[in-house]
Amino acid sequence: MLQPNRRKFRKEHKGRNEGLATRGTKVSFGEWGLKAIGRGRLTARQIEAARRAMTRHIKRGGRIWIRIFPDKPISKKPAEVRMGNGKGNPEYWVAEIQPGKVLYEMDGVNEALAREAFALAAAKLPIPTTFVTRHLG
């Protein structure tokens, strides 16, 4: 699963996920893309599950690019622990997603197969997405 190798600080503030994506909004590497039209957080497990679904569907053909990376740690306290005593330990990693961000790209397959593969991937993700092409944004 995806996670950073090293970080300057182990824990991070919660922050706010506002605004629209300004970078990574165009299909740059492949011919087809899966773009977020909603906002939210994608965990490393969700990103990997969607990648596996696409890879299995396109079999040996084509190439897939993952355009997002889970670089934000989410901490959690253990079960049945009293309040206080500091922040919990980092439990998993997420990527914060704004509307307009291209999540995955694909090349080397026809459009029908790409649409099917992205539909399988979108079912694994908690945010609404849409199919985009390199030429039609």
Swiss-Prot record:
One of its GO terms (biological process) is translation. InterPro entries: Ribosomal_uL16, Ribosomal_uL16_bact-type, Ribosomal_uL16_CS, Ribosomal_uL16_dom, Ribosomal_uL16_sf. It holds the Pfam family Ribosomal_L16. Residues 1-22 are annotated as: Disordered. Keywords: Ribonucleoprotein, Ribosomal protein, RNA-binding, rRNA-binding, tRNA-binding. Residues 1-14 have a biased composition (Basic residues). GO terms for cellular component: cytosolic large ribosomal subunit. The keyword Ribosomal protein applies. One of its GO terms (molecular function) is rRNA binding. NCBIfam families: rplP_bact. Binds 23S rRNA and is also seen to make contacts with the A and possibly P site tRNAs. Part of the 50S ribosomal subunit. Belongs to the universal ribosomal protein uL16 family. This is Large ribosomal subunit protein uL16. It comes from Dechloromonas aromatica (strain RCB).
